[in-house]
Regions:
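Nucleic acid-binding interface residues in structured DNA/RNA-binding domains
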Residues: 1-106
Length: 106
C-alpha cells in the first residue's frame, strides 16, 4: 500500500518535465516538509518507474545521488542513460548546467 506521503511525492514528481531534474530538497520544500531522507526512501520503492520518473531526482549539488537503491554500478548507469535520452547531460556524476536544468515547483 502506498502512503499518502508517497502519493504526494509521486504526484509532484510526475510534474517534472523531460529535460529537467529536481532535488530531494525541492520536493520536500514543495510539500512544506524537511523530510529529505523520507523522500529518498519513497524514490527507492517507486512502483511505477519510469512513469513516475524518479531518475529525474538528484542531490542538491547536482550530483546524481542514487538510483533504485544503488549509489553506483549498473543502476546508476541506467539513470544516466534515462537522463541522456531526455536531454540531460551528465559528466563526472554531475548534471551539466545544473542550475538551468533544475525544476523548481511553483
Amino acid at each position: 500500500m502506498i502512503s499518502p506521503f508517497a502519493k504526494k511525492v509521486y504526484k509532484l514528481l510526475r510534474s517534472v518535465p523531460k529535460g529537467k531534474v529536481t532535488t530531494y530538497k525541492e520536493l520536500a520544500k514543495a510539500m512544506d516538509s524537511n523530510a529529505f531522507q523520507a523522500i529518498g526512501q519513497v524514490m527507492r520503492s517507486n512502483p511505477d518507474a519510469p512513469n513516475t520518473p524518479c531518475h529525474r531526482v538528484v542531490s542538491a549539488n547536482g550530483t546524481l545521488g542514487g538510483f533504485m537503491g544503488a549509489k553506483s554500478g549498473p543502476k546508476v548507469v541506467k539513470k544516466i542513460r534515462l537522463l541522456k535520452k531526455e536531454g540531460v547531460v551528465v559528466h563526472g556524476n554531475r548534471v551539466v548546467d545544473f542550475e538551468r536544468k533544475l525544476w523548481k515547483f511553483q
